[in-house]
Swiss-Prot record:
Residues 234-293 bind DNA. Belongs to the Abd-B homeobox family. Transmembrane segments: none annotated. The keyword Transcription regulation applies. Residues 8-18 have a biased composition (Gly residues). It comes from Gallus gallus (Chicken). Keywords: Developmental protein, DNA-binding, Homeobox, Nucleus, Transcription, Transcription regulation. This is Homeobox protein Hox-D13. One of its GO terms (biological process) is regulation of transcription by RNA polymerase II. InterPro entries: AP_axis_regulatory_Homeobox, HD, Homeobox_CS, Homeodomain-like_sf, HoxA13_N. Residues 1-20, 55-75 are annotated as: Disordered. CDD domains: homeodomain (cd00086).
Length: 301
């Protein structure tokens, strides 16, 4: 095993350091499984991923593996650090790695159908497939990740404005991005019965949006007024006086065009009318006399 390590550090490693190339090999475990592990380590080194040896180690040979490191070539410049993050879609967990000027690469890792990560079922995470449609620079990934994690109860840090709902608009790499806030003042949230953790808002006071319908006809009922039934006060239907009532009123008017309180009470009792009706009739009768007199003057002139 030391010979293999020496070969990898001497000639086969190229420009890499011995410690870096040695990290691709697991702890020495002698037996038939050594050849398979060496082949798996070589395949992992060729693909760019570190290989960690599996199985139980016993005795003095068991020791923790050092962290895996890449072996860059002698002539190749150092690669830009890849920025990665993960998101949940459907029944799988997708890990995304992104470099400067390179599009998102997705690696679908299978998960149990009813897996729950962070207290939320994976079926309830929002779709961020629109992020992978175009090439996005690496400096925008952190902001895009914050924009994606706008679910209720999600632990990722993002600035939240109280009393507003975050409506995130996602654009391409060359288009500006902005966040739109919809005011939800006076609204209370309620959760759906099927267990969805999103928020749906309904009006707290439904009477604010209702308008009062006013009729142009007198005596109609005001409609669309919740929790109240108010009759609009208007003119009552005109009830003509009887001949006996009119005769009694005309006789009193012939005696005196103006009535006092005692005379009004007496006429009200005799005609079965209210005192207000008697007073109004005398007022209208005086106006009628003035119109008649004015017409006579016009005819004479």
């Amino acid at each position: 095993m030391d010979g293999l390590r020496g070969d990898s550090s001497g000639g086969g490693g190229g420009g890499g350091t011995p410690g870096q190339c040695r990290n691709f090999l697991s702890s020495p475990v002698f037996g038939a499984a050594h050849t398979g592990r060496a082949a798996a380590a070589a395949a992992a080194a060729a693909s760019g991923f570190a290989y960690a040896g599996g199985g139980e180690r016993s005795g003095a040979a068991a020791r923790p593996d050092p962290p895996a490191k890449d072996c860059p070539g002698s002539g190749a410049p150092p690669a830009a650090p890849a920025l990665g993050y993960g998101y949940h879609f459907g029944n799988g967990y997708y890990s995304c790695r992104m470099s400067n000027g390179v599009g998102i690469q997705q690696n679908a890792l299978k998960s149990p159908p009813h897996a729950s990560i962070g207290g939320f079922p994976v079926e309830k995470y929002m779709d961020v497939s629109s992020l992978t449609s175009t090439s996005v620079p690496a400096n925008e990934v952190s902001t895009r990740a914050k924009e994606v994690s706008s679910y209720q109860g999600y632990t990722n840090p993002y600035q939240h404005v109280p009393g507003y709902i975050d409506m995130v608009s996602t654009f391409g790499s060359g288009e500006p991005r902005h966040e739109t806030y919809i005011s939800m003042e006076g609204y209370q949230s309620w959760t759906l019965a099927n267990g969805w953790n999103g928020q749906v808002y309904c009006a707290k006071d439904q009477t604010q949006s209702s308008h009062f319908w006013k009729s142009s006809f007198p005596g109609d009922v005001a409609l669309n007024q919740p929790e109240m039934c108010v009759y609009r006060r208007g003119r009552k239907k005109r009830v003509p006086y009887t001949k006996l009532q009119l005769k009694e009123l005309e006789n009193e008017y012939a005696i005196n065009k103006f009535i006092n309180k005692d005379k009004r009470r007496r006429i009200s009792a005799a005609t079965n009318l209210s005192e207000r009706q008697v007073t109004i009739w005398f007022q209208n009768r005086r106006v009628k006399d003035k119109k008649i007199v004015s017409k006579l003057k016009d005819n004479v002139s």
